[in-house]
Curated annotation (Swiss-Prot):
Entry-linked InterPro entries: Ribosomal_bL12, Ribosomal_bL12_C, Ribosomal_bL12_C/ClpS-like, Ribosomal_bL12_oligo, Ribosomal_bL12_oligo_N_sf
Gene Ontology BP term (one): translation
Alphabetical list of NCBIfam families matching this protein: L12
Family (UniProt): Belongs to the bacterial ribosomal protein bL12 family.
Name of the protein this chain belongs to: Large ribosomal subunit protein bL12
Encoding gene, per UniProt annotation: rplL
Oligomer and partners: Homodimer. Part of the ribosomal stalk of the 50S ribosomal subunit. Forms a multimeric L10(L12)X complex, where L10 forms an elongated spine to which 2 to 4 L12 dimers bind in a sequential fashion. Binds GTP-bound translation factors.
Organism: Pseudomonas syringae pv. tomato (strain ATCC BAA-871 / DC3000)
Length: 121
């Protein structure tokens, strides 16, 4: 006769805590295993290794050379004069969204050269 999983679960449910602990010890000895929960170490390490691949170029402030910054925003985004001015006037805000690291670094350098304060996120 075979014992079903439900029968085993019902039998364990009727046991006291001490009996369950003794049962676990018996399982560990019989099968050479431990009932300890596994650590999440390797998964956490893998998360640390992941590198950010997409960046947002944030214009923090235009600085004193606002016209140059507007020109730089137009050059980087392809926006018209009115739209680029709105982006610069609306600082802090995103100039470019989800761009590669190289493009983000170039955009940051261009905007900083024009006189803006920029941050990559």
């Amino acid at each position: 006769m075979s014992i079903s999983q439900d029968d085993i679960l019902n039998a364990v449910a009727e046991m006291s805590v001490i009996q369950v602990v003794e049962l676990i010890k018996a399982f560990e000895e019989k099968f050479g295993v431990t009932a300890a929960a596994g650590s999440a170490g390797p998964a956490a390490a893998a998360a640390v290794v992941e590198e950010q691949t997409e960046f947002n170029v944030m214009l923090l402030e235009a600085g004193e050379k606002k016209v140059n910054v507007i020109k730089a925003v137009r050059e980087l985004t392809g926006l018209g004069l009115k739209e680029a001015k709105a982006v610069v006037d609306g600082a802090p805000g995103i100039v470019l969204e989800a761009v590669a690291k190289d493009a983000a670094d170039k955009a940051k350098a261009t905007l900083e050269e024009a006189g803006a304060k920029v941050e990559l996120k």
